[in-house]
Design a protein with these regions (language model features):
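Short amphipathic alpha-helix that is part of the acyltransferase structural core
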Residues: 1-19
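Short secondary-structure junctions
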Residues: 3, 19-21, 97-101
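A conserved beta-strand-loop-helix scaffold within acyl/acetyltransferase catalytic domains
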Residues: 20-27, 32-45
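Conserved acetyl-CoA-binding loop-helix of GNAT-fold acetyltransferases
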Residues: 55-71, 89, 93
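Conserved GNAT acetyl-CoA-binding A-motif
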Residues: 71-83
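Conserved active-site alpha-helix within GNAT-family acetyltransferase domains
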Residues: 83-101
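Conserved catalytic-core motifs of GNAT/GCN5-like acyltransferases
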Residues: 97-114
Length: 129
């Protein structure tokens, strides 16, 4: 896992599927050249955003395990674009719980519906069912 700059991180978020991504002041981490995580510190938790090169989707659990080693001891909120329900399945396997839909204001001031999932602090011990 490599810490990368905001410009590169934002470009990768857009390249790998979040076309409307605007940097919210995140710290970016690149896993094995194919998965970027944007971590945004909030009050008492981190927002976690992820984008991945679709050709290497089969490696998503390894990437998730790596970011959880770094941030799993914090409470995490996964903010997922509402047209990506498969990402919710991935988040569930990484220990994120109950799924809700919330309208949030984005960095550019627009309001959009997102899937929201939470993960309590704790170690990751492999796939959650």
């Amino acid at each position: 896992m490599t810490n990368i700059d905001a410009i590169t991180g934002s470009q990768l978020m857009r390249l790998w599927g979040v076309s409307s991504w605007i940097d919210p002041g995140a710290n970016y981490y690149l896993w094995d050249g194919c998965c970027v995580f944007a971590m945004v510190k909030q009050s008492g938790f981190y927002d976690i955003h992820v984008a991945m090169d679709k050709r290497r989707w089969s490696e998503c659990r390894k990437a998730g395990e790596s970011i959880l080693k770094m941030f799993g001891h914090h409470k995490l909120r996964a903010v997922i674009i509402s047209d990506r329900p498969r990402v919710c399945n991935y988040a569930r396997r990484m220990g994120f719980g109950e799924l809700t839909i919330q309208t949030l204001k984005t960095v550019d001031g627009r309001e959009s519906a997102f899937f929201i999932m939470w993960r309590d602090p704790g170690e990751y011990h492999g796939r959650s069912n």
